[in-house]
Amino acid sequence: RLAHYGLKYRQKILLYGSPGCGKTMGAERIAWNTGLPLVKVRFDAMVSSYLGETATNLREVFETAAADPCLLFIDECDALAKSREDAQEVGEIKRVVNTFLQLLDEYEVTNGLLIAATNLTKFLDEAVWRRFDDVIEVPKPTDLEIRTILKQTLAAVEVGSVDWDTIVHRLNGFSAAQIVKIAQNAAKRAILDREDLVIQEHLEASIKDVIVSHAG
């Protein structure tokens, strides 16, 4: 099925873009479309204060992913490079980065994919960049994508009268994560209002809440 979507076997992809732009959603969608189980790990959570364990943790993740074909998704992959700013840990961090590079070189799972994501490209080690077959920017959602995200998020609830063109226009420039949150909050508002349908007013109020929270 990978070939059907124009993806090579053993392909390694790096996604980059601003926070919340939809990198994780993109990886999840690829996993769903290709039928591959998703193995997801965050590097910022893996790199603990005791860095001596990090290389071991890395190997365990890659061993798990290599056991069966899957989509290995590595989020916040810049976390290792960012940690090098701490001069007291430079030696250990270099060892961890070298381990990661070695694991990327060795990662060969038939019909599997490896996707990494980062918000901070300037902090990512150049040697890491070179390990990926494709480097793809994930921009803010287009109007069509905004509409799709809204309708998919609200698919499990009844939706009443909504001027989608107006809502989409208001959400232009919002991140995918913000759009999902707005749709979810609109559904919660409908429940609190004891309404059977999510309507225009619920979405408008949710948009206003996000704008106000960011302004504060």
What are the roles of these predicted feature ranges?
Residues 143-216:
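C-terminal alpha-helical "lid" subdomain
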